[in-house]
């Protein structure tokens, strides 16, 4: 994940996930598309600071994969001043079998954090099932004394959790995805 990475080719700042081969060859990047902003006119927030590049997929060890960043997947209605373009479905239509979902969600100890958690998790599972894709979401871990804003783990193409990390603190997990399943 490269937040505020300025690409040398165009000089623009992107919030991005970068893809490399196992040998370190750079394949390209996905930039956050549904950038957060206020619902005012004009909107204010990261929507004013980050550029967007076209949605694309990548070949990793012969598997078509894609990436989404945080709000790209769930299009939170409280901070998405543009239409929900259903990026999970678009990646599925482009042939993606696995989507890596990088999350840097806000969190707190309030009831509203519980509402956001439920919204994030249900969107994640429903969009994986609707697109028939595997989704690997990973949220940041700070502050470590609060539950993350969305579960981290692996959701299969039927929308079911097959691996899930503990919800507080820095965690590690691994899971072998069987695409023939």
PLM region descriptions:
Residues 8-98, 102-103, 112, 116-119:
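Active-site catalytic loop in hydrolytic enzyme cores
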Residues 30, 58, 138, 165, ...:
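Hydrophobic residues at beta-strand termini and immediately following loops
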Residues 3, 15-19, 56-57, 152-154, ...:
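Short beta-strand scaffold segments in enzyme catalytic cores
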Residues 177-181:
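A short C-terminal boundary segment appended to hydrolase-like catalytic domains
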């Amino acid at each position: 994940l490269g937040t505020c990475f300025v690409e040398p080719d165009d000089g623009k700042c992107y919030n991005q996930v970068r893809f490399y081969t196992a040998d370190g060859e750079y394949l390209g990047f996905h930039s956050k598309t549904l950038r957060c902003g206020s619902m005012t006119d004009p909107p204010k927030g990261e929507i004013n600071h980050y550029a967007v590049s076209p949605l694309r997929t990548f070949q990793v060890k012969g598997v078509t994969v894609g990436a989404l960043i945080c709000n790209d997947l769930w299009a939170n209605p409280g901070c998405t001043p543009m239409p929900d373009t259903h990026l999970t479905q678009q990646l599925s239509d482009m042939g993606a079998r696995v989507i890596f979902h990088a999350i840097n969600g806000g969190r707190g100890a309030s009831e509203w954090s519980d509402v956001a958690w439920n919204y994030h998790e249900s969107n994640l599972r429903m969009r994986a099932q609707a697109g028939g894709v595997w989704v690997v979401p990973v949220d940041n871990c700070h502050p470590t004394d609060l539950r993350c804003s969305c579960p981290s783990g692996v959701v299969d193409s039927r929308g079911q959790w097959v691996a899930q990390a503990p919800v507080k603190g820095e965690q590690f997990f691994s899971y072998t995805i069987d695409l023939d399943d």
